[in-house]
Amino acid sequence: MASTYTANLKLELIPTGAQSGIWGATTNINLGSSSATQTGIEQAIVGKATLPTGDFSSNVATYTMSDSNATQTARAFVLDITATLTAAGTVNVPQIQKPYLVFNNSVGGFAVTIRVTGLGGGISIPNGKKVWVYTDGANNVLSALDYLPTLSLGAALPVLSGGTGVTTSTGTGSVVLSTSPTLVTPILGTPTSGTLTNATGLPLTTGVTGT
């Protein structure tokens, strides 16, 4: 009786009584090879697959899963896209239940979309970013953690936190500004009383009495 394979990771299932004397080798490959080439469960949990330029045609790479417990790109935990692209890229993955950590390290500065083979949609990953995605086995690629190109705040981020918002500071000492800063003259409003001791440019004919 021939072996069968699991639906998602394609691990080999040995029929009862089969592979006498050699089943241990099959089991070891299912668990993970002792060599530098990762297989089976080990590849699915910690394996990293590089997606090079040679895997892409017209900026599209498609990966499938066959009935084999040997190394397969689509089984790897990490998909590291290193290809040189000339436009926005697409990586097609098989219709299985599988989490991926995807690195868009492609050359060319383009985003790459991860999607199920033959379907639209998917998750777009900006160049230089890393994103968790999950294929649910029902033609969907879901993102567990989207990259946020912009962030909206309820209020301006204070200067002390690296922003441009106004911050309140107390204490003594010198105020240090950048070279040639632009100073904005404050609007003081109309005071109701006060003593002016030193000023320039005040027209004395405007509402002023005294000697």
Where are these regions (language model features)?
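Short, aromatic/His-centered strand-loop micro-motif at the edge of beta-sheets
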Residues: 117-125
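Extracellular beta-strand solenoids
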Residues: 93, 102, 143, 150-153, ...
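Tight coil/turn sites that cap or link beta-strands
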Residues: 96, 127-130, 180
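Alpha-helix capping/hinge segments and adjacent helical runs
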Residues: 162-164
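Short, surface-exposed terminal/edge motifs of secreted or surface/virion proteins that either
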Residues: 31-46, 108-117, 132-150, 180-188, ...
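Short, recurring structural edge motifs at helix starts
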Residues: 120, 159-160
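Exposed extracellular interaction/assembly regions and N-terminal maturation sites
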Residues: 2-112, 187-188
